[in-house]
């Protein structure tokens, strides 16, 4: 994804403004995984959000490697790691594409040496078939592949903001034309058209969660599989900073025709306060995301 590789992309803001993942989700992955825990590779790791979380949340792996095609993202991940060297002593980062495991070395690449491969908030940019076949070539028998992501948040307590949550990212006068496709459409669809191949993986588990279900306790408890529930308390200013981490926002800012236009993220704050004047820019409100996950074990 070229935007995230741009030298002027703010990877520090990306790291600080994106949501993290709940402990109970990592516990579920721990319970799902069978066998050894020598090596975990987190592809498309970005600034190491999930990579570094897994180093703390999962039962220990001897080695964790985060890989990403963006040198900008990897640099940020390494800076964060260096801030807590003892905590992340088993973590390293490599510049590499999602389907390229050459960084393992000639004696290990395509030799079924990996115990777990994760792809977090990134698989919509991949050639999914190429990725899963490369994962198959590098995972040991019964090794875990875990793919998850999120998109299109809502403010559950403020349904009057729902149309804003469509207008800001997808409005034709705003960011809509600036998303790289088909990646964004795949993510909006929660990768429902990308399937783990049952000839390559078994014990496949898939879950989709609609953020609006948090408004309906009946629907929330009807999920047959435990959903990935990503929720966060944010101020309007913090949410605007999250908007600024979107690749479409970066592209919008780069377009000269938008030079004199009102900033989309600033407009979101202004419009939110107009609709709910009792709020301030520093009022904490809950945001919840649509999510999905796909788990499998190598045959």
UniProtKB/Swiss-Prot annotation:
Gene3D superfamilies: Vaccinia Virus protein VP39. CDD domains: AdoMet_MTases (cd02440). It holds the Pfam family Methyltransf_31. This is Trans-aconitate 3-methyltransferase. The keyword Methyltransferase applies. It is an enzyme of class 2 (transferase). Catalyzes the S-adenosylmethionine monomethyl esterification of trans-aconitate and 3-isopropylmalate at high affinity and of other molecules like cis-aconitate, isocitrate, and citrate at lower velocities and affinities. The function of trans-aconitate methylation appears to be in reducing the toxicity of this spontaneous breakdown product of cis-aconitate. Induction: During amino acid starvation. PANTHER family: METHYLTRANSF_11 DOMAIN-CONTAINING PROTEIN, METHYLTRANSFERASE TYPE 11 DOMAIN-CONTAINING PROTEIN. One of its GO terms (molecular function) is trans-aconitate 3-methyltransferase activity. It catalyses: trans-aconitate + S-adenosyl-L-methionine = (E)-2-(methoxycarbonylmethyl)but-2-enedioate + S-adenosyl-L-homocysteine. It is found in: Cytoplasm. It comes from the Eukaryota. It comes from Saccharomyces cerevisiae (strain ATCC 204508 / S288c). GO terms for biological process: cellular response to amino acid starvation; methylation. The modification N-acetylserine is found at residue 2. InterPro entries: Diverse_substrate_MTase (IPR051052), Methyltranfer_dom (IPR025714), SAM-dependent_MTases_sf (IPR029063). The keyword Lipid biosynthesis does not apply. Keywords: Acetylation, Cytoplasm, Methyltransferase, S-adenosyl-L-methionine, Transferase.
């Amino acid at each position: 994804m070229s935007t995230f590789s741009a030298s002027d992309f703010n990877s520090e803001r990306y790291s600080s403004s994106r949501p993290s993942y709940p402990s109970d989700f990592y516990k579920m992955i721990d319970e799902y995984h069978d066998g050894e825990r020598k090596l975990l590779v987190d592809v498309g790791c970005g600034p190491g959000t999930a990579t570094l979380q897994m180093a703390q949340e999962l039962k220990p792996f001897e080695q964790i490697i985060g890989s990403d095609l963006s040198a900008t993202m990897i640099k940020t991940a390494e800076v964060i790691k260096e801030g807590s060297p003892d905590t992340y002593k088993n973590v390293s980062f490599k510049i590499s594409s999602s389907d390229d495991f050459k960084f393992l070395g000639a004696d290990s690449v395509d030799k079924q040496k990996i115990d777990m491969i994760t792809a977090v908030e990134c698989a919509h940019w991949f050639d999914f078939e190429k990725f899963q076949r490369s994962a198959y070539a590098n995972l040991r028998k019964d090794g875990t592949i875990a793919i998850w992501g999120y998109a299109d948040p809502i403010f559950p307590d403020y349904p009057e903001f729902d149309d804003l949550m469509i207008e800001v990212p997808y409005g034709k006068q705003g960011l809509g034309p600036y998303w790289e496709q088909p990646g964004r459409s795949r993510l909006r669809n929660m990768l429902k058209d990308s399937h783990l191949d049952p000839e390559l993986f078994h014990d496949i588990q898939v879950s989709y969660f609609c953020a609006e279900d948090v408004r309906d306790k009946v629907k929330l408890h009807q999920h047959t599989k435990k959903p990935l529930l990503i929720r966060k308390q944010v101020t309007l200013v913090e949410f605007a900073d999250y908007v600024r981490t979107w690749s479409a926002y970066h592209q919008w800012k780069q377009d000269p025709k938008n030079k004199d236009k009102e900033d989309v993220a600033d407009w979101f704050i202004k419009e939110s306060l107009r609709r709910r004047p009792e709020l301030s820019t520093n009022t904490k409100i809950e945001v919840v995301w649509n999510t999905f996950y796909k788990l499998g074990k190598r045959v």
